[in-house]
Amino acid sequence: MAGYPPNPGSGYPYGGAGGYGAPPPPYGSSPAPSAPPYGAKPPKEGKTSSSSAPYYGGGGGYGAPPSTQPYGSGGGYGAPPSSQPYGAPYGAPPPSSAPYGAPGGYGSPFASLVPSAFPPGTDPNVVACFQAADRDGSGMIDDKELQSALSGYSQSFSLRTVHLLMYLFTNTNVRKIGPKEFTSVFYSLQNWRSIFERFDRDRSGKIDATELRDALLSLGYSVSPTVLDLLVSKFDKTGGKNKAIEYDNFIECCLTVKGLTEKFKEKDTAFSGSATFTYEAFMLTVLPFLIA
């Protein structure tokens, strides 16, 4: 992305375990014979359970075109793990670790953020950008400071998108981030910008439903046509008239899909594409994405 310093030579970009450009297969791209049929009887009262895979498509590697099979003819969502971590999307942290500086699981969304430091080899421009935003020298920057810092690199985001970024990279709603989280946000945005430009094939500054589907597949998320239509309608600034989304809304869309999928997989311990939540866990999972 124009104006961004290059990623560190150590390959720091957030979660790039397989090397940039080579993410694991999309979550749900292999058969899942153990998954119950769509529309299965819901669990007992007091629990909320997602249905098993209604209609999820398979996908290829990073940047690959959709499969020659009809969309959705691949394996069910929630397929058994391959040699890669179960469904780990491009840009995800190792499955054994919580987001930077955050406790794991479904703890309080207002838990304190653990102080952090810049990872070794962080680009000096990233350090300078953070320090310029950290006006009080506290070692933390808030939502408006992050918004201002990103705008210096031609990244104009709404506060809602900034709040989602902060939540996804800290797993808290304290709306402050430290050096390590800022570095992760910075390089993840750089990578997502590259993906957006890769799939904006007509260079319109927008991506349509087909381009969004391919972009999400490259990130490791295989969503059904119904979900895809909902995403486009939600994030299209014209209310669905253009049936296309711009870059800033693309980021918000990716953050929403990424966050909800990762929260779901924390409960899908049987790799079945189905999970059971208590009422409180369900509310704590969904509400941060609604009230960001």
From Swiss-Prot:
One Pfam family here: EF-hand_7
InterPro entries: CML48/49/50, EF-hand-dom_pair, EF_Hand_1_Ca_BS, EF_hand_dom
Induction record: Up-regulated in leaves of mycorrhizal plants upon arbuscular mycorrhizal (AM) symbioses with G.intraradices.
Biased composition (Gly residues): 12-21
Keyword Transmembrane: no
Binding site for Ca(2+) 1: 134, 136, 138, 140, 145
Skewed-composition ranges (Pro residues): 22-40
Annotated GO MF terms: calcium ion binding
Region feature (Disordered): 1-80
GO biological process: response to symbiotic fungus
EF-hand domain residues: 121-156, 187-222
Annotated residues for binding of Ca(2+) 2: 200, 202, 204, 206, 211
TM spans (from-to): none
Its biological purpose: Potential calcium sensor.
Protein name in UniProt: Calcium-binding protein CBP
Native organism: Oryza sativa subsp. japonica
Gene coding for it: CBP
